[in-house]
Amino acid sequence: MRVVFMGTPEFSVPILTAIIGHGYEVVAAYTQPPRPAGRRGLELTKSPVHEKAEQFGIPVFTPKSLKGAEEQDVFASLEADVAIVVAYGLLLPQAILDAPRLGCYNGHASLLPRWRGAAPIQRAIMAGDSETGMMIMKMDAGLDTGPVAMAEKVAITPDMTAGELHDRLSMIGADLMIRALGALERESLALQPQAEEGVTYAAKIDKAEARIDWSKPAQDVHNTIRGLSPFPGAWCEMEINGAVERVKLQRSALGEGSGEPGTVLDDRLTVACGEGAVRLVTLQRSGGKPLPAQEFLRGAQVSKVL
């Protein structure tokens, strides 16, 4: 079976690796173009999928768009049986969707139709969901609206971070995709339309959302911290040794106590919220590494969180 793989971030890599490892012929990898990196932006960094594909000698394509006739002709010339799409980052025009003999299949990190869109892992945690999952669906022209081929549910534990859920779903996605490809080869892959009820959208994370609002209830603050950990990272400003610093909050837990929002309640860095309190477990000062709260507090007197 001739496969075109389309993906960009680290989340996609285990699925690409599994497809290769199970002997499928990956004739091309499509991924986002290299991005400027470094302090001056003079270096170009290839995506994780780009690097992995090159390790296996797979031709890599990095178009900025697939809307043009020339790019669509190149894609069609690959004569793919199927395209596998996992967090690629570009919309696929109908001409691309129609090109593979068996269609295009997407690995999506939610229980559709909940959390269609760009940031399903973060949004599920930020909303306080108790479960999510991984789904394989056949793509159509809509945004994550195609019929579902396979799904597996995953519990979201109370302190689970987006990073932890990301890694779990990525590995589940690799297993599901291999099973889906096998069923596709055997012509036994059954498709079920998505439910019409329960549709929600996982909008891309806005930078403004990452700043913690201590006037919100503790559960909301906790969900935001774990939903944005490790990236982009929730943050706040702290008065440390009399100066205001910006600090990233990588891990938290629900705490006990109450007070004016932003007040540090004890020597464990429990901070009062609009309702309840949150204990800050892992923090990161600018230019530093993530530290447990007790280590963070060595030589740092925190008087207030802003």
From Swiss-Prot:
Asked whether the keyword Protein biosynthesis is assigned, the reply is yes
Q: What SUPFAM superfamilies does its record include?
A: FMT C-terminal domain-like (SSF50486), Formyltransferase (SSF53328)
**Binding residues for (6S)-5,6,7,8-tetrahydrofolate:** 110-113
Query: What is the purpose of this protein?
Result: Attaches a formyl group to the free amino group of methionyl-tRNA(fMet). The formyl group appears to play a dual role in the initiator identity of N-formylmethionyl-tRNA by promoting its recognition by IF2 and preventing the misappropriation of this tRNA by the elongation apparatus.
Does this UniProt record's set of keywords contain Protein biosynthesis?
A: yes
Q: Which GO terms describe its molecular function?
A: methionyl-tRNA formyltransferase activity
Provide the E.C. number(s) assigned to this enzyme. Answer: 2.1.2.9
- Which named protein is this? Methionyl-tRNA formyltransferase
Q: Report the sequence similarity comment from the record.
A: Belongs to the Fmt family.
Q: What class of enzyme is it?
A: transferase
**Catalysed transformations (reactions):** L-methionyl-tRNA(fMet) + (6R)-10-formyltetrahydrofolate = N-formyl-L-methionyl-tRNA(fMet) + (6S)-5,6,7,8-tetrahydrofolate + H(+)
Per the record, the gene is: fmt
InterPro entries for the chain: Fmt, Formyl_trans_C, Formyl_trans_C_sf, Formyl_transf_N, Formyl_transf_N_sf, Formyl_transferase-like_C_sf, GART_AS, Met-tRNA-FMT_C
List each coiled-coil range. Answer: none
Any one Pfam family match given in the protein's UniProt record, by short name: Formyl_trans_N
From what superkingdom does this record's organism come? Bacteria
Keyword field: Protein biosynthesis, Transferase
The terms describing its cellular component in GO are: cytosol
